[in-house]
Amino acid sequence: MSKKFIELGDPVTQDEKDYEDYVGVGFAHQVPTMKRRKLTEHGNTTESKEDPEEPKSRDVFVSSQSSDESQEDSAENPEIAKEVSENCENLTETLKISNIESLDNVTERSEHTLDNHKSTEPMEEDVNNKSNIDVAINSDEDDELVLEENNKEMRDGEQVQQDLFADDQELIEYPGIMKDTTTQLDITDSEVETAQKMEMIEETEADSTFVGEDSKNQRQSGTTSDEVDADSQINLATKTVRTSSSSFLSTVSTCEAPAKGRARMYQKELEKHVIAFTEGNLTLQPDLNKVDPDRNYRYCTIPNFPASQGKLREDNRYGPKIVLPQRWREFDSRGRRRDSYFYFKRKLDGYLKCYKTTGYFMFVGLLHNMWEFDPDITYKLPALEMYYKEMSELVGREEVLEKFARVARIAKTAEDILPERIYRLVGDVESATLSHKQCAALVARMFFARPDSPFSFCRILSSDKSICVEKLKFLFTYFDKMSMDPPDGAVSFRLTKMDKDTFNEEWKDKKLRSLPEVEFFDEMLIEDTALCTQVDFANEHLGGGVLNHGSVQEEIRFLMCPEMMVGMLLCEKMKQLEAISIVGAYVFSSYTGYGHTLKWAELQPNHSRQNTNEFRDRFGRLRVETIAIDAILFKGSKLDCQTEQLNKANIIREMKKASIGFMSQGPKFTNIPIVTGWWGCGAFNGDKPLKFIIQVIAAGVADRPLHFCSFGEPELAAKCKKIIERMKQKDVTLGMLFSMINNTGLPHKHFEFYVFDRISTYLSSSEDVESSKSSPSVSRA
């Protein structure tokens, strides 16, 4: 009798607990539809021998003896041939696909077949004929559909993480996270539970007019010849930066930009940022030279830098949550042997010996084995099937099989290049720094994480939606790059937090400051920038729906930079006074579309500029920070949402959340901008004028300039600019502005610019302006 499919929340034995894969908070991954394939008289699938073999780049994860060499040796040596044959037979028998028909002739399909996908959802190769920004403006409906799907998954995921982290020990309260004891400043616990939900924020896709490297790319991107010529001239230009404080960069090579005006504009900004970093001798946090190594762990080797001296922690101090489970090791963190270790190791080794001759189903079999599925049942993986079919037509079957093998090779390196213990950012653990290769090993292991783990790619692979096929393109592109030409450097993940009393002191010191400098960019997108802090419109669970069907701002960023997914393994659900900082993530892909129209695209110059090696710091990290801050979800009519947002507790909560994120780098970054946009709007129904004002206050508290990307809403941006100019003319301080938005009153009917109108009323009356100088402190609000 076949055993049932693994169900979420099923009781597990102590032995199974030892083998748990990546665990923690996050989304539950529903199990794929369980179907048997129709049996036929045929044996294993046969593949055409006429496929031309493309020349391959060297794979850095391939052992000194390649699979080809192994197979050639086996032809000459009967003993080797017998061993390889046995390995192949064992793997194939486990899946029991000897009687399964060829992939090309599968007759039983899910409701959405590959052919249906091709006919109803074309690849939209000519999407650049319409501005990506226009697409994003009309994507609220897509956002809400995705949001509704993920709301249920988040609730299920919280239950899953409770099951996975079940432990007899009573966990000690984490030091360093001070709980609020009053409700004057913050939303009460019950309000937080109902107000803070997943974030699917509307942002535009990347600009469609990319500058191509040849005429073909130029035609696809819609870039004119004049723009290419202008960008080429700018690309040839370099600026010598002379500084006595640092030699980090002697020349700045300008990256291509997607449009002529943007290229020139951004070149000027980039030069300013370089000068600010060099003259200020700035180091993005964590500064590994100065931080406490017992709280800030470095797991990689950095040239000319001492080995990390972080202390070894006891599991029982914080419970099992503190150590990231490593299912691929022979022993767990408590020294207990994993009986399944050799089984999984043999499966990976066996697959890599015969993947070229056994085809697509061998990779499916490997996944089934690693997921511990019933060997008598074949589970459908529609997205993987569609990816295999589509890419085989484009690059050839052999290359697609090689892509699968690269994932397995990188996953195998985890045991060798990762430390025995990786501490999650709980308790007093503040940060973790890993190399690009270590990040790749962790992400590759997510392919083989069991479906009951919140951090498994099983949900993507088993989906029948075309968006998941696009996600696989992002992921396999990442592993291709990491196999062929991996970047050399490191990435830091840090939990930044502040207790209530400390924040109140910060506010008292800074509420008399003038408003910060604010610049508006109608065309530039957040991901077009470098040498700055980029805002991630985050979910309280980092990564949002990237492992499901989510495909808006945060998910797109994580697909462009898959290393960010490591943060999902390390971080728990964000609390009210927390933000998550990621420093040094590399960009591997570009994109077009947004939401359900998202498409993978080759890496373009406007996105690759932050990968410039000259921008790396002494620890090997790229000088760019992504700061994840989650906003409140508002529900109801437009009037209900607007009224609820003007509640003082909600204004204070959003201002604190943004301020803590913007202050993540400390007081020295006064010339390094924060690049943001309509945070908390879109599917979260945020009031755009109010969210803009809140971010202005937060940037002022952090004493940093604000670069605001309006995402194709120039009229609204013009109103934002006008109100800022008026307030500066009136010498409005941060405290005065905070007082204004806290005393706007409630609207009788919805009006988009209600907040701006109320501020204008204050500014028009000198008496009101003077009276607002006696601004109440945040602690009394």
Swiss-Prot record:
Role, per record: Poly(ADP-ribose) synthesized after DNA damage is only present transiently and is rapidly degraded by poly(ADP-ribose) glycohydrolase. Poly(ADP-ribose) metabolism may be required for maintenance of the normal function of neuronal cells.
Species name: Caenorhabditis elegans
Name recorded for this polypeptide: Poly(ADP-ribose) glycohydrolase 1
Region (Disordered): 28-87, 102-131, 206-232
Localization terms from the record: Nucleus
Keyword line: DNA damage, Hydrolase, Nucleus
Pfam families, alphabetized: PARG_cat_C, PARG_cat_N
Outcome of substituting residue 555 to N: No poly(ADP-ribose) glycohydrolase activity in vitro
One GO CC term on file: cytoplasm
